[in-house]
Amino acid sequence: KTVNLPLWDQLKKEAIGFFDQMGGSKEAGKILFGLFFNGFYLPHELGHGVQFFVKGDEKGSYKNELFANQIGMQWWRKHGQEANLKSCYDFAQNIMGILPNPVPKGMTVEEYFNKNYDQVSSNPFIYGFLQFGQFIKVYNDKSLGDFDTLIRSYMGIK
């Protein structure tokens, strides 16, 4: 598996506009992008690497993204990145106040994500709603085991 690290200067104008809008300013948009895409999503992708190693190549699902977000969160906590996590959390809360909820009434976020993964993953507004919502959920989950415990549990090691 390969992790592609996006660089701010290589983003398309539309992507920069998205981050500027979600961050509230050009400066904040660049910080938002850096915190998530050059920071948090690196250990998040480590979570997907663990999934691939343990279970093989699985199609994207809500559960897979949740595990990757848990790994990303607990990796940063293990490495003393609480201040960066708090900054990400604050951005995520702001973004969730901006993005419309794409999930139809009568469906859960998980059902919608699983049934529409290809469409969801190709739309930054919908995918953002789901990813930033999961980030908030994981950040607030006080029952979540630490990084080492999550890895051992996923691999079936006691």
Located regions from the model:
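Long, well-structured alpha-helical subdomains associated
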Residues: 78-158
